């Protein structure tokens, strides 16, 4: 079961989320939740568009690290009251990971998933001069800073992060180009099913940082 705290057409409010978690609890189910603060993201997007800032570089600027961390903290307080375990899906920031560690210190059962692109790519991909090249990396949460990558690798090594999944979205390059001129119209997501295993195997064996370090 997956829930979203962002995307207006898909997001779930606190009351509905709490009730859904209580229902899952009856049957031993567990939910995975996409954590970003939708309201502030929408306000930042509106400000960027009003200023004519519509390039892919605006994408990470409208979804900064604190908005993921705030949503994770918010969710974890709800699950604390609900008394249920939870999965944080595609976690991408050091700040969000800190909120997970705080919840675990309170005795909560929290699982964490990240993705290969958060381990291997950083936000420089959005600042390429070639619009199409930058657009292909639009996803949410966006790629983060190198320091976030380092924290994620260490967390994967010590078991703080349990799962690496793909969040696979198989948009073509032509579909990505459909949003030319407005980053909010670029379909969000990256493919990853075919490459996850190879990427992780290669990086764990031959590159640094890795869990072996």
Task: Please report, for each region that a protein language model flagged, where it lies by residue.
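Histidine/acidic residue-rich metal-binding segments in metalloenzymes
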Residues: 2-4, 9-164, 180
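Short glycine/serine- and small hydrophobic-enriched flexible loop segments
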Residues: 77, 201-205
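Ser/Thr-centric signal marking residues that sit
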Residues: 114, 166, 195, 207
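Conserved, mostly hydrophobic/aromatic
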Residues: 167, 200
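Gly/Ser/Thr-rich active-site loops/lids in small-molecule metabolic enzymes
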Residues: 183-198
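Conserved small/polar residues in nucleotide/adenosyl-binding loops
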Residues: 206-213
